[in-house]
């Protein structure tokens, strides 16, 4: 089963990296049993809930990724892959030049949100966003 947004751990990592909470389109909050629940509204619409943490859907994560990156006068375009191997379907994101060289490529993930999360972390850590 594919995730629909970042996990609590991933959301906390994105906050640590300084990703703007206004880019999140969902939020995690505590319910009356102190269990995390996912709310399909931006965190700004969850003012009445306790202990809110923003969450990013795949769409929100993709929206953070630049269409291309210029590095050393080489243009790297955003690419995404869905492939199959002996482990089943896998997802990957990266930035690739027209000369088939990669600036960065994520690991292969069974869940597309996990691949997008790794890409956002790399982009932020390398000051590309």
Language model features with spans:
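Glycine-rich anion-binding surface patch
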Residues: 1-129
């Amino acid at each position: 089963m594919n995730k629909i947004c970042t996990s609590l751990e991933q959301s906390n990592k994105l906050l640590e990296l300084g990703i703007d909470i206004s880019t999140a389109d969902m939020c995690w909050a505590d319910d009356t049993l102190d269990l995390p629940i996912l709310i399909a509204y931006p965190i700004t619409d969850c003012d009445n809930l306790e202990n809110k943490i923003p969450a990013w859907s795949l769409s929100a994560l993709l929206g953070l990724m630049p269409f291309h990156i210029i590095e050393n006068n080489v243009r790297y375009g955003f690419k995404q892959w869905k492939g199959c191997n002996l482990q089943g379907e896998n997802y990957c994101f990266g930035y690739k030049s027209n000369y088939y060289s990669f600036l960065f490529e994520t690991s292969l993930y069974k869940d597309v949100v996990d691949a997008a999360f790794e890409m956002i972390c790399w982009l932020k850590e390398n000051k590309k966003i």
